Amino acid sequence: MINQKLLVSGADYFTDDYKINPYYTEIKINREKAIAEHARIVECFREAGIEIIKVDPPKGCQDGVYTANWAIVKDGIAVMARLPEARKGEEAYARKKLEEQGIKTYLVPENYLYSGQGDSLRCGKYLFAGRGYRSDPEAQTFVADKLGLELVQVHANPQLNADGSIHINPATNHADSFWYDLDLAISIIDEHTIAYCPGALDEESNKKLEAIQDLDKIIVDYDECTKGFACNLVSTGKHVIMSANAPKLKSALEARGLICITPEITELLKGGGYIRCISLWLS
């Protein structure tokens, strides 16, 4: 079983003051609704038998609701994130909260970007690692070495401007993608199964995934991935808390005997985050 204990915060400071990814639009966020959605997701986690560690969100941090970006945790060890400048206020707070749980923390070297669990998905012996947007490849190598995992680095397709050039996000000054974090393109179903969207990843990355023979793979529909946040789910290996707008993936999971729970979400996704994004896997 996976995702048996999760750390969550809250949407108390969730706003759209700075548009840190392509999902922030001109449509205003309803914070009260976002808080209710967050509470419903946490309720779904508990329905699935998951233990929840609830901490206050860091004050004044609009993206502090997305705890998945705070670190990656394995066997009582956490490698802390190096977030974009707009989220730097979360870093020390996140480390403090994990250390309060008795978790030993390590820091990625200072000159590298690293997006925590958002860009590092562990499945059995593998670490599926995003690079090129919110995480540097050197940071992912550091993480894999520290956690003793076999590194599989992949790269999502970029967001393009009308002229075909790669879009640079003005809030981060980095290249942007609709799959800026890997947990929008790949999900871990159990220790032997992943679900992923080939259309979200470049050709080399697809070849890497296809070459892995000791994992079962579920292909995720491109529209469900991009419009329904299909991959941004939390699975225990028995229950899956997932998008209500991904019927094909839901059917594929139910055909494998998994129980799917599908809360309705409209506000949290406006910040580019969904079910996986608001939860950090502790054990």
Model-derived regions, located:
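The feature marks the mature, well-folded catalytic cores of soluble enzymes
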Residues: 1-283
